[in-house]
């Protein structure tokens, strides 16, 4: 029985991992479709698509699925007609939250997000309700293996006019986040792509002016549970906030 229980636990974990991977692949596919429809279906002529493909490759989305998403973008299927929507609100512990979604049904997405916020003791707000707590910036992310060292990308980013460079640990490797003014984003992204190849992520971002730490381990656990529920929503692409875990 113990052996059977262990097998069942492994099978359950694998099933959960497969489901999470499937959700991630679906989100990457949607990002590619929206990017391809924003301009040319040729990545070299469409920086948004090039960035979306780079993100997809970083998370191991198979090449045939990337190509299928680009083909889908050239069709007129209603289910693949996505709208970019930004939601703002307060999560547990009054942390400011910005949710970036791609949806083919605005009412459904708003209802589902409102339910998640409310269930975790937060509140979904109106557009602009928390934006004053953030700066709108450009963000280009590289893995450490892509650039060699902090000093290398620091020198390059600084020479291009970036306003900051942050070092992060994503659990697998170090990442370098190049921060720039919105008006400089395209120029700096393209120059870095030319120097280091495509980054893991390149997009406009909401950067908190100040970060707040949860008051306790219990508060941290509540916030993580809330963020996990947001991430599990099919329409949510990514979440930003003024929290520090």
From Swiss-Prot:
Subcellular location: Cytoplasm
InterPro entries per record: Integrase-like_N, TACO1_YebC-like_2nd/3rd_dom, TACO1_YebC_N, Transcrip_reg_TACO1-like, Transcrip_reg_TACO1-like_dom3, YebC-like
Keyword Ligase assigned: no
Domain of life from the UniProt record: Bacteria
GO MF terms, alphabetically ordered: DNA binding
Pfam families for the chain: TACO1_YebC_N, Transcrip_reg
Disulphide bond pairs: none
One cellular-component annotation, GO: cytoplasm
Keywords for the protein's UniProt record, in alphabetical order: Cytoplasm, DNA-binding, Transcription, Transcription regulation
BP GO annotations: regulation of DNA-templated transcription
Main subcellular location: cytoplasm
UniProt similarity note: Belongs to the TACO1 family.
UniProt-recorded name of the protein: Probable transcriptional regulatory protein APH_0480
Species whose genome carries this gene: Anaplasma phagocytophilum (strain HZ)
């Amino acid at each position: 029985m113990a052996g059977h229980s262990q097998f069942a636990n492994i099978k359950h974990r694998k099933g959960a991992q497969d489901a999470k991977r499937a959700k991630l692949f679906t989100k990457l596919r949607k990002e590619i479709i929206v990017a391809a429809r924003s301009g040319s279906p040729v990545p070299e002529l469409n920086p948004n698509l090039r960035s979306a493909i780079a993100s997809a490759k970083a998370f191991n989305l198979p090449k045939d699925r990337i190509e299928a998403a680009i083909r889908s973008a050239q069709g007129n299927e209603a289910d693949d007609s996505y709208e970019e929507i930004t939601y703002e609100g307060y999560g547990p512990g009054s942390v400011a939250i910005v949710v970036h979604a791609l949806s083919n049904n605005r009412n459904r997405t708003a209802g589902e997000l409102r339910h998640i916020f409310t269930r975790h003791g937060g509140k979904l707000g109106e557009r602009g309700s928390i934006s004053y707590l953030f700066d709108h910036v450009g963000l280009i992310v590289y893995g450490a293996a892509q650039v060699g060292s902090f000093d290398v990308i620091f020198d390059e980013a600084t020479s291009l006019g970036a306003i900051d460079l942050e070092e992060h640990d994503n659990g697998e490797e170090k990442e370098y986040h190049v921060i720039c003014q919105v008006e400089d984003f395209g120029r700096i992204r393209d120059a870095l792509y030319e120097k280091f190849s495509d980054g893991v992520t390149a997009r406009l971002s909401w950067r908190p002016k100040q970060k707040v730490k949860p008051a306790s381990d219990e508060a941290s656990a509540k916030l993580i549970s809330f963020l996990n529920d947001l991430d599990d929503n099919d329409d949510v692409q990514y979440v930003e906030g003024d929290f520090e875990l």
